[in-house]
Regions:
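A short glycine-rich, Lys/Arg-flanked "PGG" loop and its adjoining helix->strand segment in the class I
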Residues: 120-135
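Conserved class I S-adenosyl-L-methionine
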Residues: 136-169
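Acceptor-substrate binding/catalytic loop of class I
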Residues: 172-190
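Conserved N-terminal segment of class I S-adenosyl-L-methionine
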Residues: 10-95, 251
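A C-terminal cap/extension of S-adenosyl-L-methionine-dependent methyltransferases
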Residues: 191, 195-258
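A short beta-strand submotif of the Rossmann-like class I SAM-dependent methyltransferase core
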Residues: 106-112, 138
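A short acidic, Gly/Pro-enriched loop at the edge of an enzyme's catalytic core
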Residues: 95-107
Length: 258
């Protein structure tokens, strides 16, 4: 019961999610919870290491930076959000990015793709702005047996894998979403993706993080276990790796421009 209680978030009025103040509150929560902050740090470090191993040069941009703190880990990153946030370098929509053709080395997004109302438009922009060999690095909700149970029953965001279209009606940048969009684009409709975006290629689709985020309490609940057990939980997750296609809550997706 503790697990289910912890997962349940407010179902009613979600308009507060679209306020910049809410995003800053989320940032303070992340920074104040060592277990949750460490999850973000590990994800940021993975991206930074991958990016720095690439031979390409150019701008590295985070889209939908929100309350994150990637710049503390990777100082040269240009942070951005659709909302006016004092902690971000730029404000713009993923549908219309203010960068020249073939100018970006990398685009990083953490739990952002499934909030973008028109992903075809975003991917067109990514295809335009990325240089040859540049890449999009995304960490997104996974669509697994376990994640469907969690996201459909205990999370406020829609999680509907039955819809045909990648687009959805949006009243606000955070209150509207569909958590299955990454799975739709890069698994169910991969052939369509390849046809629509001939210059882009799926390179990595990897499931991970089945239990760690739940135990952190996320943004809405307290930690379920103390921070000193983080290493043990990481070890347990490694043991569970063969089951990730069934139990992972997140996935890393890397798309490269040919």
């Amino acid at each position: 019961h503790c697990f289910l209680y912890f997962c349940r978030v407010m179902e009613n009025n979600l308009s507060h999610l679209d306020l910049p103040e809410t995003t800053m509150t989320h940032r303070n929560i992340i920074l104040s919870k060592p277990f949750l902050k460490r999850i973000y740090i590990d994800w940021y470090v993975e991206f930074k290491n991958f990016s720095q191993q690439q031979s390409t040069t150019g701008k590295v941009v985070e889209i939908g930076s929100g309350g994150g703190f990637l710049k503390e880990i990777y100082p040269s990153v240009i942070t951005s959000d659709i909302m006016p946030l004092s902690v971000c370098d730029m404000q713009f929509s993923a549908h219309e990015m203010p960068f020249e053709n073939n100018s970006l080395k990398a685009i990083f997004m953490l739990n952002v793709l499934h909030h973008i109302p028109d992903n075809e438009q975003f991917l067109q922009e990514a295809q335009r702005t990325l240089q040859k060999g540049g890449f999009i690095y995304m960490i997104e909700p996974a669509n697994t047996f376990f994640s469907r149970f969690i996201y459909k029953n205990f999370h406020h965001e829609p999680f509907d894998e039955t819809v045909a279209d990648w687009k959805f009606e949006s009243k606000g940048p955070l209150s509207d979403a569909n958590g299955t969009i990454p799975w739709m684009i890069f698994k169910r409709d991969l052939k369509k993706f390849n046809q629509l975006f001939p210059e882009l290629e799926l390179e990595v689709f990897r499931h991970h993080t089945p239990i760690k985020y739940l135990l952190s309490g996320g943004l809405s609940k307290p930690n379920l276990i103390p921070y000193f057990l983080f290493g043990l939980v990481t070890f347990i997750e490694k043991l569970l790796t063969p089951l990730n296609s069934k139990i992972a809550l997140f996935q890393t997706i890397i798309v490269r421009k040919k």
